[in-house]
């Protein structure tokens, strides 16, 4: 049975003082799920220091597809690896939308993360217009296929997927548990076409306005293995409640 995984995405929030209080609150209480936080780059060293020796992992919100060089503003996977980074989000809808990241770039970022022992959390999801046009499976299938084409079976076995319907991120809207389960089942079936064992073991997270009051229902679905949490990850009590859902 796959253990639940709950990853907090702080996005562009935080301060040294607020982070310290949040991290101390998270690591002080037990959770049924595995927990991790993805913090802004300037705070990764703080996460490393405060979470060292705890059961809470930490990660980055992005990683460069490039190994090194004249790429101002980029952060290399090798740099994250030196800090002991566990996870890196790749292909979050906000990166795809605001920075024009293509499926190929997302796959390249996943490959680079894996090269340095970092688990890429590959995010896929459709807009409201795409859902209403009946294109959900076409869109998320295309996004996933880029990774399937780029990764070996062994590499794929070290990946986490996250389904984040763009229309449900930060809007207060949430896909129903049945809607989310249908997409998660589709994604797992696509991975199974490549390797059944990998598909059965892979964590597929749901991200889209997950809160303490809807987490249990979402997480009860057979193919939903946890959550990628935005706003609710900024309050330790909410994040822990989701981790215990």
UniProtKB/Swiss-Prot annotation:
**Residues engaged in binding substrate:** 9-11, 170, 209, 230-231
Quote the subcellular location field of this record: Cytoplasm
> What keywords are annotated for this sequence in UniProt?
Cytoplasm, Gluconeogenesis, Glycolysis, Isomerase
Gene3D superfamilies in UniProt: Aldolase class I (3.20.20.70)
Chief subcellular location equals: cytoplasm
Which residues act catalytically here?
92 (electrophile), 164 (proton acceptor)
Q: For this UniProt entry, which segments traverse the membrane?
A: none
Q: What is the uppermost EC class here?
A: isomerase
EC number(s) on file: 5.3.1.1
Extract the InterPro entries matched here: Aldolase_TIM, TIM_sf, TrioseP_Isoase_bac/euk, Triosephosphate_isomerase, Triosephosphate_isomerase_AS
Which GO BP annotation is one of this protein's? gluconeogenesis
Named in its record, the pathway it takes part in is:
Carbohydrate biosynthesis; gluconeogenesis; Carbohydrate degradation; glycolysis; D-glyceraldehyde 3-phosphate from glycerone phosphate: step 1/1
What CDD domains does the record point to?
Answer: TIM
Which reaction does this chain catalyze?
D-glyceraldehyde 3-phosphate = dihydroxyacetone phosphate
A family per Pfam: TIM
Top-level taxon: Bacteria
Q: Name one GO molecular function term.
A: triose-phosphate isomerase activity
A GO CC annotation recorded here is: cytosol
Family membership noted in the UniProt record? Belongs to the triosephosphate isomerase family.
Q: How does it assemble?
A: Homodimer.
Explain the purpose of this protein.
Involved in the gluconeogenesis. Catalyzes stereospecifically the conversion of dihydroxyacetone phosphate (DHAP) to D-glyceraldehyde-3-phosphate (G3P).
List the protein's name. Triosephosphate isomerase
**Which organism encodes this protein?**
Cupriavidus pinatubonensis (strain JMP 134 / LMG 1197) (Cupriavidus necator (strain JMP 134))
Record lineage: Bacteria, Pseudomonadati, Pseudomonadota, Betaproteobacteria, Burkholderiales
Gene transcribed to yield this protein? tpiA
């Amino acid at each position: 049975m796959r253990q639940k995984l709950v990853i907090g995405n702080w996005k562009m929030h935080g301060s040294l003082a607020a982070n310290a209080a949040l991290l101390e609150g998270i690591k002080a209480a037990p959770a049924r799920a595995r927990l991790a936080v993805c913090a802004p780059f300037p705070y990764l060293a703080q996460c490393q220091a405060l979470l060292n020796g705890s059961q809470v992992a930490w990660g980055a919100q992005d990683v460069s597809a490039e190994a090194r060089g004249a790429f101002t503003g980029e952060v290399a996977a090798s740099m994250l690896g030196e800090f002991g980074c566990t996870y890196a989000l790749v292909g979050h809808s906000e990166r795809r939308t605001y920075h024009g990241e293509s499926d190929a770039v997302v796959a390249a970022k996943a490959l680079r993360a894996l090269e340095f022992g970092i688990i890429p959390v590959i995010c896929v999801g459709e807009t409201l217009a795409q859902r209403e046009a009946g294109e959900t499976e076409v869109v998320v299938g295309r996004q996933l296929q880029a990774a399937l084409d780029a990764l070996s079976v062994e590499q794929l076995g070290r990946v986490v997927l996250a389904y984040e319907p763009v229309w449900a991120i930060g809007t207060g809207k949430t896909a129903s548990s049945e809607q989310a389960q249908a997409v998660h089942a589709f994604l797992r079936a696509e991975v199974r076409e490549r390797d059944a064992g990998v598909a059965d073991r892979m964590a597929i997270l749901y991200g889209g306005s997950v809160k303490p009051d809807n987490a249990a229902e979402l997480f009860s679905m057979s193919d939903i293995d946890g959550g990628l949490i935005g706003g609710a990850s900024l309050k330790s009590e909410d994040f822990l409640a989701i981790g215990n859902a």
